[in-house]
Amino acid sequence: MYNLNNEYKDFIKDNIVDSSKNYYSMIFPGIPDSGRKIHVSCTLKNYNNILDIVSRYCVKNRISFKVIKDINKYFANGHKNGDRSSYGKFITIYPKNEDDFIRHIENLYFNLYDYEGPFILSDLRYKDCKCLYYRYGSNIINRTYDSKGNICRLIEYNGISYIDKPRPYFYLPDFIKNPIEQNENISKSSNLLFKYKIDEVLKFSPIGGVYKAIQKYTNLKCVVKEFYPHTAIVNEKIDSLFLYTKEVSNLKKLKEFKFIPNIIEHFKDWQNYYIIEEYISGDSLDNYVSKNNSIILESDYKKSIKYIYDAVNILIKVTENIISLYEKGYIFTDLAPDNIIINKNNVYFVDLESVFMLNDNKDALNYTINFFNCTNSNEDNIKLVITNLLLYCFNKKSKVYDKFTPRQILSPIIRRCYQVDNILDLINEINDSETSIFRIKLLFEDYSKKIFSAVSSGEYNEPNLEPTKKEIFQVKSTMISSVGYEYDILENKNSLAYGTLGQFLALNYIFDYKHSKDTFLNYIKDYRSNSFFYGYSGLLYVLDLNEIGSNDIVEKILGNIDYTDKSLSTGISGIGISLLYNYLAKKNANTLKVLREISLTLKENEELDNSLETGRLGVSLFYIYYYYIFKDTEALSLAEKIINQVILDYKDNGYKKIISNQLKDNHYEYYLSNGICGLLSVLVEFTIKTKQTKYTDNIIEFTKLCFGIYSLSSSYFHGNAGFLYTFFRMQKNINISKKLEKNILNQINNFYLDITNTIINDEVYDISLQGNRKNFLGGKEGVYTILDMVNRNDDSKNIFPFII
């Protein structure tokens, strides 16, 4: 608790409420459902004084307020990975009405005028007080939920309703008037925009934006880097202004290096600080890898070898730059893949606030996890960053580099291209205690020459791959802990697809458990959404699977269907599939009537994308099951029509994915949720349910496109478990040649090993580093279900969402 020093401190201590994991609240009667709310920001120097002043005023005037519980979390939110829409909101005050708001904010203005805090992006500043802000918003939880079961903050204003969404900018609907005419939200100065035309936003963070711009009087392309005051706070001396000053100093000191952008100018404009520097065209290393890593995006072996050669040559230049800095007494502590620019034959370093002298005090240390270690020597950190940048060129799962060995990290790639095994030898040499950092560049150059020589002589030929041997990973009941229902009024934590309900589904599938109705009582009470993935339709399926009476659930669903949402995940395609499963057992006439209405409504689906989760493939899955149950030939025709259109769209455009906002090039998407594996699974389902083989050639064509794919995630709907599921069912149900089957079996084994390679102590670690993530489509429950299916060599169980 904070150190209050006003006459109400004992009253506050006795009456403050620990209202949530993030706030302490002082509640008085009269909080409106929605209205003006006042936000007060703070700095490390003044937060106790500000809280003392504001709490005294609020208690004296009986105004409800809340304060951030942990001041360290408040400041952490102001760093580069924080939430721009919420940073700065130290205290929130809830006036009872508009008149009270005007009176109280004016009084607080006089009390807080001399204090500063970060600018709150979602609010208007009150006059010229640098810590006092306000906005119109929702104040209560009114139990209005979206289709995913999460709270919508609904505002009713003079009979008009709208959703109050978090935004990193000020927003006020036209029908709500601002009672205060004067504010200081907009800059009094326009030095930046007078000189520069902003062309593109490169990135945003709570610290500020980075923009691509043009200098108006020269037409020179440049980068504008923005620093908001009172962000990136580390201690009373180190914050965003310190970072700004440090980067300006570094750019000037390092101008002798050709791989450092030139600084054009720097200045303060209004309250913000700006650095203008030379624009370096090209891709960040992060984007370069996404665009060019042909080992996992192509089946062309020669392209894969060329990529290895190119990656090694990039690392030669990176190493050369690092050693050049080191020889002059510098080290770059945040040399992450997004701070390296690949420009034709050159490699540049950017974002230089984290360049230090070797013996500097590094209190203001910025670094990216697993590319710097505060406890290492400078030389060991150079080896660490070079090693992990090299690993990143082949496997971008950098957040778990400290969890796995380089061999484990590279093994999925080595199975797809054996020559990557030599990268392991290179890494071992780099990290040998006898290897000097000055020798690393020579190691890369020698390896580059070997690759070039081998390619020229034809030594590297595409291998004749034999099925990879795998050890069976035995799934045990102790690996899935059904913690059950978790109450959270704001967020739906209990959905079938991405919540706690999926744990029971995994136990059903893997161990044939039958749960009692008592297990699901809290789920039944908590009605938020009708949807298949997130709401009652998913619960209905689980109840039916466990042979638990569900008539009340069915009636609730039938009475609350939104026919405008047609998707599998949240709309009538998924709801319809759950109702079809229920109808098979119950033969409810009302259910049949609604199913017919759903079938009619889904005929119009052109507005949807082509994905399984949110698009037309989900609609086609409903029609496949509708045909299977009712032998309705129109449903069969509709399923075929959708599938044919998706295939045609694919041939014209492909499943396209922008891997990064900065990328102009597209790549195929493969995932079950929204890619080729989703299409393949629907085609397999069509073949099984209709006993027709008309799509066999298409299945073979799309299967070949998936050879060599690999995901950074092990999950079922967005990763390797989905690939494994798709290929396993295809191998079991589609008539293919022996040669193709051999290749498919190799892919199955690869996917299996890709997954088991990420399991530590029964937890599945993916790129998110969430080893204890417990849900079906995105977590370990789905992963273990698919592994068990392959272990049994049996696809007779219908795995969600393919449930019929």
Q: What positions do the PLM features span?
A:
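ATP-binding glycine-rich phosphate-binding loop
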Residues: 8-22, 184-217
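ATP-binding glycine-rich loop module of kinase domains
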Residues: 35-44, 199-201, 206-247
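Terminal, non-catalytic domain-edge segments
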Residues: 115, 438, 442-485, 685, ...
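Juxta-kinase regulatory segment immediately upstream of eukaryotic protein kinase catalytic domains
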Residues: 148-200
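Structural motif at the C-terminus of the N-lobe alphaC helix and the adjacent alphaC-beta4 loop
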Residues: 249-259
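Short beta-strand micro-motifs within the conserved protein kinase catalytic domain, predominantly
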Residues: 262-273
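Catalytic-loop of the protein kinase fold
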Residues: 322-342
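C-lobe/activation-segment region of protein kinase-like
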Residues: 354-422
